[in-house]
């Protein structure tokens, strides 16, 4: 078994990915049985390669599913927590840009009645 290239996996359909995942899992199970029963280590080094291949297939499949789910939530204001961008705790609690630019009535009146003075120098 040779290493699986991720760019090749991205070209496959979901059904093909699931079929390949099933095949890899069966092969992995048979390798583990071989590891216990047979003492020769000729193909046992392939266990790591198969495990990594399974991880790659699952990664591509899950990324695709998450992208589809993200497209569904583009028009909805509330998004599930696991779909939101990963931010620090402080950034999650920070004010939104709209909230930052809001002014109180008193502050607005003060700005209207006493605008910032502009000076121009004649040269």
Swiss-Prot record:
NCBIfam families: L29
PROSITE patterns in UniProt: RIBOSOMAL_L29
Pfam family, any one: Ribosomal_L29
Keywords carried by this UniProt record: Ribonucleoprotein, Ribosomal protein
A GO BP entry: translation
The protein, known as: Large ribosomal subunit protein uL29
InterPro entries per the UniProt record, alphabetical: Ribosomal_uL29, Ribosomal_uL29_CS, Ribosomal_uL29_euk, Ribosomal_uL29_sf
The organism of origin for this protein: Babesia bovis
Stored HAMAP family: Ribosomal_uL29
Gene Ontology CC entries for this record: cytosolic large ribosomal subunit
Gene3D superfamilies: 1.10.287.310, 6.10.250.3450
GO molecular function, one term: mRNA binding
Family listed: Belongs to the universal ribosomal protein uL29 family.
Superkingdom field: Eukaryota
PANTHER family linked to this entry: 60S RIBOSOMAL PROTEIN L35, LARGE RIBOSOMAL SUBUNIT PROTEIN UL29-RELATED
């Amino acid at each position: 078994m040779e290493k699986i290239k991720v760019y090749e996996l991205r070209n496959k359909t979901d059904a093909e990915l699931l079929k390949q995942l099933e095949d890899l899992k069966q092969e992995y199970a048979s390798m583990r049985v071989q590891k216990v029963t047979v003492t020769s280590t000729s193909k046992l080094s392939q266990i790591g390669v198969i495990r990594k291949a399974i991880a790659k297939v699952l990664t591509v499949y899950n990324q695709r599913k998450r992208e589809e789910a993200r497209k569904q939530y583009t028009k909805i204001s509330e998004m599930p927590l696991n779909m939101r961008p990963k931010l620090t705790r402080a950034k999650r609690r920070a004010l939104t840009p709209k909230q930052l630019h809001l002014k109180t009535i008193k502050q607005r009146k003060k700005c209207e009645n006493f605008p910032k003075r502009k000076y121009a120098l004649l040269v």
